[in-house]
């Protein structure tokens, strides 16, 4: 809900779409309190890439019959719901940085730590960190090129695609890196939930 609230406060977003699995359609019940431009599509897949591809397919197909729907040239922001600490300021910064870009881009952070390669629990190599970034979301690309990039890997079960930027890279594009926030971390493990709660309390 924190993610939806942040997205809902960005006036330039014409539509906010939540893609859920058909089996989880009950998880996000219809809520009249949400803005009218919020909608839910129960077409999620087994992976993030498949869910994004299915969602884009549904939106573009709808746009074929509705000129006010999503068109291939429209910008799409894809956000991972596990990054529930995203703020409207970070979303706006990404939009400002990418709106006039030929490709689009993503929020990311320069890698601050030394990066090690492990083999059987021991360090085998230390990698230079100067050119390494940690990818975040949202990631912003035009609907048509992103859909085409994902479609090109659909028959391979989206092998090698870990985010939208990686799909665009495989299609020959170089996404723009936009500095994000360390607070926009992915809530995955139990300690992450406690940390996220602390951050949310500090914002009140």
Model-inferred region functions:
Residues 22, 110-113, 182, 191:
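Glycine-rich beta-alpha junction loops
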Residues 27-29, 94, 196:
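Hydrophobic packing residues within well-ordered alpha-helices of enzyme cores
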Residues 55, 79-80, 110, 142, ...:
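Residue-level signal for inorganic ion chemistry
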């Amino acid at each position: 809900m924190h993610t939806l609230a942040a997205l809902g406060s960005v006036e330039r977003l014409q539509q906010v779409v939540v893609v859920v699995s058909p089996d989880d359609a009950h998880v996000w019940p219809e809520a009249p309190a949400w803005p009218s431009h919020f909608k839910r599509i129960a077409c999620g897949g087994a992976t993030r890439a498949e869910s994004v591809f299915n969602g884009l397919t549904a939106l573009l197909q709808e746009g074929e019959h509705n000129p006010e729907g999503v068109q291939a040239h429209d910008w799409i922001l894809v956000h991972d719901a596990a990054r529930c600490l995203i703020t409207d300021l970070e979303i706006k910064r990404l939009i400002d940085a990418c709106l006039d870009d030929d490709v689009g881009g993503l929020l990311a952070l320069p890698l601050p730590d030394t990066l090690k390669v492990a083999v059987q629990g021991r360090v085998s190599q230390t990698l230079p960190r100067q050119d390494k970034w940690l990818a975040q979301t949202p990631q912003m690309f035009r609907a048509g090129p992103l859909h085409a990039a994902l479609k090109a890997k659909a028959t391979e079960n989206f092998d090698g695609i870990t985010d939208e930027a990686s799909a665009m890279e495989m299609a020959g594009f170089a996404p723009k890196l936009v500095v994000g926030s360390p607070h926009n971390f992915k809530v995955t493990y139990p300690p992450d939930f406690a940390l996220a709660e602390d951050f949310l309390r500090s914002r009140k």
